[in-house]
Amino acid sequence: MVDMDWKRKMVSSDLPNSPKLSSKLHVTIPSPFKIVPVSSPISCSAPALCSAYELYLRLPELRKLWSSRDFPQWTSEPILKPALQALEISFRLVFAVCSDTRPYINHREWNRRLDSLITKQIQLVAAICEDEEEEGISAEAPVGGGRSSLSLLPQLATWRRSEALGKKILYTIDNEMSRCKYTLGLGEQNIAGKPNLRYDAICRPNEIYSLKDNPYADHIDNHENQTLYIIHQILESWIYASGNLLNRIVSSIEEEKFGKASNDVYLLEKIWKILAEIEDLHMLMDPEDFLKLKKQLQIKSTGKNDAFCFRSKGLVEMMKMSKDLRQKVPAVLAVEVDPTGGPRLQEAAMKLYARKTECDKIHLLQGMQAVEAAAKSFFFGYRQLVAAMMGSAEMNATASQESCDSLSQIFMEPTYFPSLDAAKTFLGEFWSHLG
């Protein structure tokens, strides 16, 4: 029970005709209040499984491309480089799907899903570029006059099988980059005559293309092998970008640049949603061919809470870092955690919400909770995806006898932000008593 009389006094001047409240408003609040380390159900699979996953996707080679710094003065390069490389790999997926001659493949739905996924990626790239301009660093971006000569997209826009989708992508780039000072330079119209980003120098499409084959390409005769490989390379590229974005969010909060952190935290939410859309592409793979590939690649559960996604060290780290944003709430609210477990944080949050004088902080806290929702949704959706692709027996095999599987534990965990949750509970109860 918590005394809410201070809140009544705080807002009473704004509500002269409101019904009189009792001197004390008592509400039941979620527990616990005290921020304590929460045992996380997420951890990497066995080292041998993680290593096999990395070698299959050629992640060590990709990581060198993601982490290369060709333009040290350009502060957005660590985020935009892997993002643009994810986009380029997506063009390779379009090429692979359009080249697939199997008569039983749902090409129409593939085209729709790829259009949607690439559009969302372009929107996210454009949002990152727009934020550069707001922060006054767009001048650092490497631009030039020429278009890309190495990207696959111009070829997709002229090849008969992919022409419609390729031209649609070019139109999307033109539209989404309209608010930026430069454009991507992939063959879009660019009627405004804006400078082109030095796409080839940043993205290195030729080096990306050199990684087009996985180690099993020569001795596994299964078209879904290439599809699976490309899908996960796109996924891992965005995961790498998110790690750099999370580091930037933490730095911005520590420097009290809450507006910048707010912009970035919503970009992070979008990345989680893009990851879910990438995973959903698995549903378009042929069921029998996919299960045959699973056998050929010797992919199997160990039966010890070993969901397949936990073989990605990057994804596990991304989830942990997203969850650890909860530790930055006291810094945002400018109060210290009460060592006795008192309601110091939630009271500060309620005052922040009510006064509305520090909007950047409100937006940041809302964004943090949006990231939590998106991350938990990703793992919930992934659990359903595994069951749909491989059967529920496969999903149940990852659960131990003592508890439910790790994926279920993730989205069933209590909120990562109990103080914000309690503050909103109080405010909701307060306003409900005014009516």
UniProtKB/Swiss-Prot annotation:
- Where does this protein reside within or beyond the cell? Cytoplasm
This entry's Gene Ontology molecular function terms read: heme binding; metal ion binding
**Where, by residue number, does the polypeptide cross the bilayer?**
none
Instruction: Name any GO cellular component annotation.
Output: cytoplasm
Record's note on what induces expression: By bacterial pathogen P.syringae pv. tomato. By Salycilic acid (SA). By the bacterial elicitor flg22.
Pfam families given for it?
Answer: Hs1pro-1_C (PF07014), Hs1pro-1_N (PF07231)
Q: Which UniProt keywords apply?
A: Cytoplasm, Plant defense
Q: Which InterPro entries match?
A: Hs1pro-1_C, HSPRO1/HSPRO2, HSPRO1_N, Trp/Indoleamine_2_3_dOase-like
Q: What happens when the gene is disrupted?
A: Shows high sensibility to P.syringae pv. tomato infection.
Q: Name one GO biological process term.
A: defense response to bacterium
Quote the subunit structure annotation. Interacts with SNF4.
**The protein's role, per its UniProt record:** Positive regulator of basal resistance.
Q: What's the protein called, per UniProt?
A: Nematode resistance protein-like HSPRO2
Which source organism does the UniProt entry give?
Arabidopsis thaliana (Mouse-ear cress)
Lineage of origin: Eukaryota, Viridiplantae, Streptophyta, Embryophyta, Tracheophyta
